[in-house]
C-alpha cells in the first residue's frame, strides 16, 4: 500500500490598512451681471440700404461685466455668449423685424457665432461690435428696423 502524504503549506498573507482622508474647499461661482442688468441700446440712425455690406455702420457694443465676489477657482472659466433668433443667411447675425436684414455681432473683427461661448477675462473684456447685414439678392424696404439679442456670461 502506498502512502501519499500531502503537505499543506500555509501561506501567510499580510494585509496593511491605511486611513484615507478627503478634504477640500467648496467654492460658489460668483454671480455676474452684464451692464448692471440694463438693456444695451445700439442706435444705427439712418442706414442707406445700398451701403449695408457687413462693415459699414459698425458700432461698438458698450458692455461691462461685474461679479459679486473676487473669489475665483483657477480651474473655472468665464465665458460670454449671445443668443437670439438667428437670421436665415448668417449664423453670426440675429434676424430683425425686416425680412433679409440682420444684425451681426463681431469679436476682434471676426464673426461671433450665436450660442458659441467665448472664453473671456473679466479684467480685459473683448471689444464687441454690431453691424447690419443683409441677405444677398434681397430688396429691403425703407422702414424702421429693430432686432433683439441676449448677452450671457457663465462661470464654470
Task: Give each language-model segment a name.
Residues 2, 16-156:
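Mature extracellular/passenger domains of Gram-negative fimbrial/pilin and adhesin proteins
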Residues 3-13:
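Sec-dependent N-terminal signal peptides
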Amino acid at each position: 500500500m502506498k502512502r501519499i502524504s500531502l503537505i499543506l503549506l500555509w501561506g501567510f498573507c499580510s494585509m496593511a490598512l491605511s486611513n484615507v482622508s478627503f478634504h477640500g474647499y467648496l467654492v460658489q461661482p460668483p454671480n455676474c451681471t452684464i451692464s448692471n442688468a440694463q438693456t444695451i441700446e445700439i442706435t444705427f440712425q439712418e442706414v442707406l440700404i445700398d451701403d449695408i455690406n457687413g462693415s459699414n455702420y459698425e458700432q461698438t457694443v458698450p458692455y461691462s461685466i461685474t461679479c459679486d465676489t473676487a473669489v475665483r477657482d483657477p480651474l473655472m472659466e468665464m465665458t460670454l455668449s449671445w443668443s437670439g433668433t438667428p437670421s436665415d443667411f448668417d449664423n453670426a447675425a440675429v434676424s430683425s423685424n425686416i425680412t433679409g436684414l440682420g444684425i451681426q455681432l463681431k469679436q476682434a473683427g471676426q464673426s461671433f457665432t450665436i450660442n458659441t461661448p467665448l472664453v473671456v477675462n473679466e479684467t480685459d473684456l473683448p471689444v464687441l461690435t454690431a453691424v447690419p447685414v443683409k441677405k444677398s439678392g434681397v430688396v429691403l424696404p425703407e422702414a424702421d428696423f429693430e432686432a433683439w439679442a441676449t448677452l450671457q456670461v457663465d462661470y464654470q
